[in-house]
Amino acid sequence: MSASVKESLQLQLLEMEMLFSMFPNQGEVKLEDVNALTNIKRYLEGTREALPPKIEFVITLQIEEPKVKIDLQVTMPHSYPYVALQLFGRSSELDRHQQLLLNKGLTSYIGTFDPGELCVCAAIQWLQDNSASYFLNRKLVYEPSTQAKPVKNTFLRMWIYSHHIYQQDLRKKILDVGKRLDVTGFCMTGKPGIICVEGFKEHCEEFWHTIRYPNWKHISCKHAESVETEGNGEDLRLFHSFEELLLEAHGDYGLRNDYHMNLGQFLEFLKKHKSEHVFQILFGIESKSSDS
């Protein structure tokens, strides 16, 4: 296993060298962790024992026609290119629906590559060659037309239960994925761990798939609520952003991660966000008003 990971990391460094040669100007390739490549080199040389964090970065692409920018967010799992690359394109000139379509097209294209093939450079080329049509479609959607039919979307809210959520890197991943996909909701850390994610169905399902990868076993979707909408779904949201929820804990033993979150506080939080009905679904016990 370690040999294959090392082989993957060597290929990742090779691809990063190619990217820096393609984008030599400062700021064009922005690493999430500026020490990421150094740590991987040390790991491959044997001077670092622990597996280094994954390479995460953003490349800002200048599209010539129309004159727009696309930020391509890239996460390289340790076993990439032998497992799927995580990519997401974002532009302030695209609405959520067109951004979703753009990323569907990009993901479909990357899915044609065989395991072991490097594909970041190919993804960049695909965006430069194909993104113009998505910006054009956005203009067409907003042109007045008596014949145009409203586009229906599915708004989804998922309630996810985990035995616990403690690790800093996992918590960071959950928040990063939530903000990257432009969903709203929260992540309650501790024991148990609860995640609520809401937004367009495609975004929520991608969030659910991404946070479970590669081996989060003690997690399940306890409840899902969906509704068809012809708008952007903003009026259906119960939350305004995606944030970490930190509550008081019972039996906090310092360095020990064996403590239970204050479910009474959590119930009050749910009431505030018109979600009291979910309490029984998550925990199998009926909610009781704090003033009764």
Swiss-Prot record:
Q: Which Pfam families match?
A: Prp3_C, RWD
This protein's source sits in the domain of life called Eukaryota
Signal peptide positions on this chain: none
Disulfide feature: none
The UniProt entry, under Gene3D superfamilies, shows:
Ubiquitin Conjugating Enzyme (3.10.110.10)
Q: Where is the RWD domain?
A: 14-134
What protein name applies here?
A: RWD domain-containing protein 2A
Name of the gene this protein is made from: RWDD2A
